[in-house]
Amino acid sequence: WDELDARIRECAACDLCKRRKRAVPGVGDRQADWLFVGEGPGAEEDERGEPFVGQAGRLLDAMLTTIDLRRGDDVFIGNAVKCRPPNNRTPETAEHAACFPYLQRQIELLQPRLIVALGRPAAQALLNQEIKIAAARGKLFAYNGIPVIVTYHPAYLLRNQPDKAKAWEDLCFARATMRRLKHGA
């Protein structure tokens, strides 16, 4: 893990490294059953080197609490792209391609039981297909045999309050899926 984190922090595989303050490898329990994957770091994450620390991070923490989870306790949080895109734009295909081996290795090391993709860019990076969140909700996908559930990114939910109820449904689906995985049902 430490070697991977160091490689991420030193990465120069795409142009995002030129503007970043800090690469953001991920944070949490390195033996977690739950992996939450976002799109990429924002301004506060770039400053602090930790994912989901701004307003969207506070919402994510609240979302975790609703299903009896806590950051760092059986939960690992990462991003599809490890450096902040300029002006918080959506990461480009080449940027995803440059970062994806890092996410792949994190998943290999972590071996989570369940992955929750937060937002369309994260879902598309993990599933390698075009995704529309509204159509993907409530369905079980897979990444290398690991179940993947798709939901809205917390930053989107901050701008689109009515969809919080849908995200709650997705989290309940994720919790029920994890219970089935743990109890073999």
Model-derived features: positions:
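A polyanion-binding, active-site-adjacent surface
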Residues: 1-185
